[in-house]
């Protein structure tokens, strides 16, 4: 039903993702202490790793497409481009567990507005075994919600 973003839509989504994530060519620990590089890549990353800007770009595309596939497989109703992009950003940030979220449940119930708003629930990180609200995650979720609620006459299933 829904299809992967391509062309200008993909380029815009990647630019938005880099704006949310930033891009670091040297591995660092994220707020939860996970070794991370480039624009949020964590798979196989260890402290001391380095990447070129081109390698970061390629990692970001690969990661975005992996999480977009998770969204497309889990959401059974048509998504417009903004909804699809926001849900992919969300999954990129929280990982495959995104499919268990209230947001995904609401979308699959045909309640897109409530699904977008439910992204706000995912605003905490675990620090020393405690869930703590993160200002950075609050800001990120607000950006994702804004993207998600932005009207679009194009549905991702009709882009190509």
UniProtKB/Swiss-Prot annotation:
It is found in: Host cell inner membrane. Its main location: host cell. It is a single-pass type II membrane protein. One of its GO terms (molecular function) is lysozyme activity. InterPro entries: Bacteriophage_GH24 (IPR051018), Endolysin_T4_type (IPR034690), Glyco_hydro_24 (IPR002196), Lysozyme-like_dom_sf (IPR023346), Lysozyme_dom_sf (IPR023347), SAR_endolysin-like (IPR043688). The chain crosses the membrane at residues 1-19. Its EC number is 3.2.1.17. Residues 20-160 are periplasmic. The active site is at residues 21, 30. Disulfide bonds: none annotated. One of its GO terms (biological process) is cell wall macromolecule catabolic process. One of its GO terms (cellular component) is membrane. Keywords: Antimicrobial, Bacteriolytic enzyme, Cytolysis, Glycosidase, Host cell inner membrane, Host cell lysis by virus, Host cell membrane, Host membrane, Hydrolase, Membrane, Signal-anchor, Transmembrane, Transmembrane helix, Viral release from host cell. It catalyses: Hydrolysis of (1->4)-beta-linkages between N-acetylmuramic acid and N-acetyl-D-glucosamine residues in a peptidoglycan and between N-acetyl-D-glucosamine residues in chitodextrins. Signal-arrest-release (SAR) endolysin with lysozyme activity that degrades host peptidoglycans and participates with the pinholin and spanin proteins in the sequential events which lead to programmed host cell lysis releasing the mature viral particles. Once the pinholin has permeabilized the host cell membrane, the SAR-endolysin is released into the periplasm where it breaks down the peptidoglycan layer. PANTHER family: LYSOZYME RRRD-RELATED (PTHR38107:SF3), PTHR38107. Belongs to the glycosyl hydrolase 24 family. The signal-anchor, which may also be an uncleaved signal sequence tethers the SAR-endolysin to the membrane until the latter is depolarized by the holin, resulting in the escape of SAR-endolysin from the membrane. This is SAR-endolysin.
């Amino acid at each position: 039903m829904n299809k992967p973003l391509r062309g200008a839509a993909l380029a815009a989504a990647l630019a938005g993702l880099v704006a949310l994530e930033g891009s670091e060519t040297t591995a660092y620990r994220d707020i939860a202490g996970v070794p991370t590089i480039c624009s949020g890549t964590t798979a196989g990353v260890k402290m001391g790793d380095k990447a070129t800007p081109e390698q970061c770009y390629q990692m970001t595309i690969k990661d975005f497409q992996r999480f977009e596939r998770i969204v497309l497989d889990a959401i059974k109703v048509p998504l417009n481009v903004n909804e699809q992009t926001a849900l992919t950003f969300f999954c990129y940030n929280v990982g495959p567990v995104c499919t268990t979220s209230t947001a995904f449940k609401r979308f699959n119930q045909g309640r897109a507005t409530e699904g977008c708003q439910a992204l706000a629930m995912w605003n905490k990180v675990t620090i020393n075994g405690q869930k703590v609200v993160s200002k950075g995650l609050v800001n990120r979720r607000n950006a994702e919600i804004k993207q998600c609620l932005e009207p679009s006459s194009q549905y991702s299933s009709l882009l190509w």
